[in-house]
Amino acid sequence: MLNEFPIFDYEDIQLIPNKCVIKSRAEADTSVTLGNHTFKLPVVPANMQTILDENVAEQLAKGGYFYIMHRFDEAGRIPFIKRMHNQGLIASISVGVKDYEYDFVSQLKADTPEYITIDIAHGHADSVISMIQHIKKELPDTFVIAGNVGTPEAVRELENAGADATKVGIGPGKVCITKVKTGFGTGGWQLAALRWCAKAARKPIIADGGIRTHGDIAKSIRFGASMIMIGSLFAGHIESPGKTIEVDGEQFKEYYGSASQYQKGAYKNVEGKRILLPAKGHLQDTLTEMEQDLQSAISYAGGRQVADLKHVDYVIVKNSIWNGDASH
């Protein structure tokens, strides 16, 4: 039962250091394997329209990073798979669960993507289980990620249906308002939800949402994530597809949720909002900084690789991360 677990989120946790065994943080290996491929970092930009487009996906794949292309350009998905495969790059796409998606999946036999993410807000659903089974029947070699979920029961059901990984997080993201609109979600206790779900998982878990700092990546690994999906930290770059808007001489980029009226084009069943983020530099600069910060985290863990973060002790001190720093 959930009540047996302490409830906390990223800002409530600090990891406890161990003796360092490497001479330089540069020796720490941040790579992670998901399915048949190994990637430079255990992070993936959120599959949202203001985070990545085909060009960003290509840049990530060429750089050795995992990506998941969003599902909001449905007609462009097959040409995208071809574009990536023609360059010797992995193809990683998203699908929904509507009836026409079944025919779409069946069309992929000729040019099969390495990864498919079933991407709906409430992933513990018969419709998702049915789609997992369909993909596995039609494309048995494709790695299937299913989500989003927030309970151990959901993780087990999706794994049993054939999912190769589950995505955990119901509404903790910066532009997600699910918890406000519906009363449901993992916002405010996403890290505890991740821990709860990970204890039931036999296959990889992708933590999705609520990441506000690079240190949250290490915390996610500690509590059971194999990969971490990140939205706001990857939004607002020069390469980001979001519109650039000038306000009082300062450059901003728009960032909106996948269930917002800005994505849907209509105000119906809205569970996302739009915000403006100060424009950042290049995406690669953020990826490099994430890698360096994760290398430092591994060194503090007394480890040499990402998996060593899973064994560190931690302390729960509510909202302690910004103690003594009034600017936050």
From Swiss-Prot:
Organism superkingdom: Bacteria
Matches recorded under SUPFAM superfamilies: Inosine monophosphate dehydrogenase (IMPDH) (SSF51412)
Keyword NADP tagged: yes
Keywords of the record: NADP, Oxidoreductase
A family per Pfam: IMPDH
The EC number(s) this enzyme carries: 1.7.1.7
A GO biological process held by the record: purine nucleotide metabolic process
Residue numbers binding NADP(+): 205-228
One MF term in the entry's GO annotations: GMP reductase activity
GO cellular component, one term: cytosol
Enzyme active site: 176 (thioimidate intermediate)
Top EC class, one word: oxidoreductase
Reactions listed under catalytic activity: IMP + NH4(+) + NADP(+) = GMP + NADPH + 2 H(+)
NADP as UniProt keyword: yes
Protein family (similarity comment): Belongs to the IMPDH/GMPR family. GuaC type 2 subfamily.
Classification via HAMAP family: GMP_reduct_type2
Role summary: Catalyzes the irreversible NADPH-dependent deamination of GMP to IMP. It functions in the conversion of nucleobase, nucleoside and nucleotide derivatives of G to A nucleotides, and in maintaining the intracellular balance of A and G nucleotides.
Protein name, per record: GMP reductase
Organism: Streptococcus pneumoniae serotype 4 (strain ATCC BAA-334 / TIGR4)
Name of the gene encoding the protein in the UniProt record: guaC
